[in-house]
């Protein structure tokens, strides 16, 4: 007997549609799949966000996109402009990459100011922000300091990875991030969560969201375990997460 309800897991998933090779047809079918499986959000290439938001209107699935993606090296001004454009285009949740170079350099004032400026404009518009650390490049001391900064700035989520670095979410990182983030900050796993068992494991560690491209496989298995009918829909490839 499963110890979860369907929406406990479906509403964890941010369905990832970020690979640069996805065509318009791929993106549209991916959005349709996300709606059918009742996920939390679709995280889509920024240029397609306006169409995505229109398709998602009234479905209960949120539109999200990326800022400073995937390496975080954009200037603060560019990241703010990206965020403003995304919000104008209907974005409800922004996945923002920190300046990894500044984190590794110990430029904490720069890092805090940048996160703060983008968080402020996001919250002023009534939307939410997820701050991506890209943990595969960081030491624990960096991750802990980022959690402290994000707690102070009242960001909505701290997120492990872009899914495009040298590694994705690890159980140790999720424990660390949950331990060092305030109660007001949620944790998102990204990269490497490709089956239902792993999704349930990250949920048990306190992650409330998970970036995923294997949505149909994971939620198809959940529906099977819960005795729910299968969803007959296919979407063309979205690899990366």
Swiss-Prot record:
The keyword Disulfide bond does not apply. InterPro entries: Aldolase_TIM (IPR013785), DeoC (IPR011343), DeoC/FbaB/LacD_aldolase (IPR002915), DeoC_typeI (IPR028581). It is found in: Cytoplasm. One of its GO terms (cellular component) is cytoplasm. It catalyses: 2-deoxy-D-ribose 5-phosphate = D-glyceraldehyde 3-phosphate + acetaldehyde. It holds the Pfam family DeoC. Keywords: Cytoplasm, Lyase, Schiff base. Pathway: Carbohydrate degradation; 2-deoxy-D-ribose 1-phosphate degradation; D-glyceraldehyde 3-phosphate and acetaldehyde from 2-deoxy-alpha-D-ribose 1-phosphate: step 2/2. Its main location: cytoplasm. GO terms for biological process: 2-deoxyribose 1-phosphate catabolic process; carbohydrate catabolic process; deoxyribonucleotide catabolic process. The active site is at residues 95, 159, 188. Gene3D superfamilies: Aldolase class I. HAMAP family: DeoC_type1 (MF_00114). Belongs to the DeoC/FbaB aldolase family. DeoC type 1 subfamily. Catalyzes a reversible aldol reaction between acetaldehyde and D-glyceraldehyde 3-phosphate to generate 2-deoxy-D-ribose 5-phosphate. This is Deoxyribose-phosphate aldolase. The lineage of its organism: Bacteria, Pseudomonadati, Planctomycetota, Planctomycetia, Pirellulales.
């Amino acid at each position: 007997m499963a110890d979860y309800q369907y929406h406990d897991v479906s509403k964890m998933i941010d369905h990832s549609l970020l690979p640069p090779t996805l065509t318009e047809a791929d993106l549209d079918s991916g959005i349709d799949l996300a709606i059918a499986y009742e996920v939390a959000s679709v995280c889509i290439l920024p240029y397609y966000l306006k169409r995505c938001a229109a398709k998602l209107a009234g479905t209960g699935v949120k539109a999200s996109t990326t800022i400073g993606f995937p390496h975080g090296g954009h200037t603060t001004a560019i990241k703010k402009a990206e965020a403003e454009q995304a919000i104008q285009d209907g974005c409800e949740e922004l996945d923002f990459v920190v300046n990894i170079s500044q984190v590794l350099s110990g430029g904490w004032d720069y890092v805090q100011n940048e996160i703060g400026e983008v968080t402020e404009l996001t919250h002023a518009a009534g939307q939410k922000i997820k701050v991506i650390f890209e943990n595969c490049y960081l030491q624990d001391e960096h991750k802990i300091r980022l959690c402290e900064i994000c707690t102070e700035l009242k960001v909505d989520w701290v997120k492990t990875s872009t899914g495009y670095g040298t590694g994705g979410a690890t159980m140790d990182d999720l424990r660390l991030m949950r331990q060092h983030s305030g109660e007001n900050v949620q944790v998102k796993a990204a990269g490497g969560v490709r089956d239902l068992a792993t999704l349930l494991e990250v949920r048990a560690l306190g992650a409330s969201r998970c970036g995923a491209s294997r949505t149909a496989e994971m939620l198809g298995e959940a529906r099977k375990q819960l005795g729910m009918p299968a969803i007959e829909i296919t979407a063309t490839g979205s690899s990366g997460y």
